């Protein structure tokens, strides 16, 4: 599952992508999730906290979805360049990303996207 849409432009699309990834994981599929472009905002702790507080989703729902992905996906990748464009680097990630990111997230870029795409049977892009 690739999450590339800016949640500030089309939040519903991002949430649907995250929900589909979480459901596929719960259904027993091997799921790799790659956050790129402005979709990397979905890994930003402040953004997720704000989204939960906004009332646009049931309270705690986004935390549950992201917990499923971060704890049970086969792998979670983020675009290093996209994160940098949003002010997140490896040096300041601990202050900005979801807790425990260094345990479940792999910094990557186009080679990772290509490899995952070439090795996947199904791709969902949001």
Question: Where do the model's predicted regions map?
Answer:
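Solvent-exposed loop/turn segments at secondary-structure junctions
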Residues: 7-8, 38-41, 82-86
């Amino acid at each position: 599952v690739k999450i590339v849409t800016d949640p500030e432009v089309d939040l519903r699309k991002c949430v649907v992508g995250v929900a589909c990834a979480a459901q596929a994981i719960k259904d027993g599929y091997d799921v790799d999730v790659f956050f790129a472009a402005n979709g990397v905002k979905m890994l930003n702790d402040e953004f997720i906290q704000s989204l939960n507080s906004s009332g646009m989703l049931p309270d705690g729902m986004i935390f549950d979805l992201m917990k499923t992905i971060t704890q049970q996906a086969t792998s979670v990748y983020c675009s290093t360049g996209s994160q940098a464009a949003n002010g997140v680097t490896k040096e300041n990630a601990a202050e900005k990303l979801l807790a425990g990111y260094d345990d479940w997230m792999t910094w990557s870029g186009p080679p990772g996207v290509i490899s995952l795409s070439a090795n996947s049977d199904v791709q969902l892009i949001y």
